[in-house]
Amino acid sequence: MLAAVAFKTSGLVVLIATTLVLVTLVSVNSDLTGTLGAIAGTWFAVHLVPLTIGGTSLGVAPLLPILIIGWSVARTVHRAVDPDTDRRMVRWVFAASLAGPLAVTAIALAVAGDASTVIGLSSPNALAAFSWVAGVHAAASGTGLILARWDSLVLRRGVPEWVRALVAPFVRALSILVAGGAAVVLLALLASWETAGALVESGRDVVGMLGLTALSVLYLPNVLIGALAVATGSTAGFGDASVSLFATTGGPLPPLPILAVLPEGPAQTIWVVMLAVPIGAGLLLGRDCAIRSADIQVAASSVWVVAAAAGVLAALFGYAAGGSLGTFGTVEVTVWSFGLLTFAWLAVAGTISAAIVVWRRAEPEPEHDEPASTVVPAAEVAIEAAPAAEPKDGPDVEDVVEAEVVDELPAEPAQEPVAEPAVDADTDEPLDAEIVAPPGDTDGPAR
């Protein structure tokens, strides 16, 4: 597993570099004398190591390959560990992720030194080579380890709650900035489509046009960072040429199709609309921080922390995207202003947005008029409060009584008290009676 971590990505880079070098040399009918030197130079170029070719300094390396390499290293390290991996194994994985690339770098330095007599490639500075390679792979490996052990770091290491709460707003703010920069590049490229097409056709044959197109794709992240720097109010320079929101300066440019995004005339007033990119990112950042905390001080502090981190990252990428380009001069963005303006826009717009969100959440709800209470007599209250009496012998009783069914017992005859029969005058039943003569009248019928 450690061998895969050490040499998987590095081996793929060397394999791809070998393929590209061989295809290029064969396509131009060149001999294979300097193949190894070209492969070593490609290894240095994709790791942002400055090179000197034929006495010309080449320090502007494309960022797309290094981003792909970083993603591959982080993915490999992420798969090599899990939240339950012990710390000793984690250290070994991290060390292996650096050992492999540094070993390849040492070999590339030796090859470049030998090839310098055959081709015009000079061996780069060893300290710079090891520093760039180690820095790139350490950052990628550390990212992979953090992603793989995030749950463990949160639970066991006690990562503060405020740090965990700021991860999502930070990622979202960066995504908006990148998307805004990409939109600016796309619109500028569409506006200069004819110029870009003419630059592609300057390659003459199919191989040349494909090469120019491939180089444009590789340098696309560099151009995106330059566009984002201009959108924040900083300046992007390409030798004597420079671009900002309020001024432009012309100068010679290499025939690279992606450079058609650079304006051919003076600055336009409509360019101020590009400020919507950092302002929009700041507004959404403030909203995200305010949603996570109802305290305006906590929300504003969160905004400023994220803005500071984004400003530092912008400055680092701005530095990595530039460098020397031989006779064309230096390609660069004004690093300090790019980082500072990124921080300022995010902090100011984010603080305003957070304050508005917190204020709206704290605003009391409108009070509704309650109906006037009705005075109820005490007698009615007592009647309503008293439970309704249920009839005992009523036939319509709806309550269900659970009882056990038993055999019916014969009822004992009730002993009725003996009473003299009373003659009811209204009875319809015949009475059996004997007619007797009244006393003193026994000889004849009564008269």
Protein language model features and the residues they cover:
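Long, glycine/tryptophan/cysteine-rich extracytoplasmic
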Residues: 1-71, 111-116, 205-274, 320-344, ...
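Extracytoplasmic/cell-surface-exposed regions of Actinobacterial cell-envelope-associated
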Residues: 127, 167, 171-184, 199, ...
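Core segments of transmembrane alpha-helices
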Residues: 277-281
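N-terminal membrane-targeting/anchoring modules of bacterial envelope and secretion proteins
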Residues: 1-210, 356, 360-364
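Alpha-helical transmembrane segments of multi-pass integral membrane proteins
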Residues: 96-155, 190, 194-196, 283-368, ...
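Hydrophobic alpha-helical transmembrane segments of integral membrane proteins
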Residues: 2, 6, 166, 271, ...
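N-terminal hydrophobic or amphipathic segments with adjacent small-residue motifs
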Residues: 94, 220, 227, 301-304
